[in-house]
């Protein structure tokens, strides 16, 4: 899909509260498109790189609750707690299998452990394809099945129009 088609399709997925995954070569504008969408919607885009995290970072940090005799999980500070926005898992498939697996529940039910994604937040991910030789980890079915997948293709005329409109030379 061309960038303009991607933006339209991602907006439709966000409106329907369906997580979406953008696939495309490095540098074609996947991330920029998500930040453009966030700006148009006037919402925060929170960029999370699973490749920089451990599996426990998604679920949270274990904390004993001695009073109740249970272990609770303190959510990571990169996970939103209020407001509206797009939780953007950029370069999702650069993360190892265990770290990707830690996000399964978040993509399906919008929660993981004790953490629940606020109602005003949506999930978008992006990554490179195997043919891009980007050292990716193939996404397991349980994660892949929780998203709509869109192929992002570079389009020279659209890029030139974007560059001219934004003073890029």
Label the predicted regions:
Residues 1-169:
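AAA+ P-loop NTPase catalytic core and its hallmark functional loops
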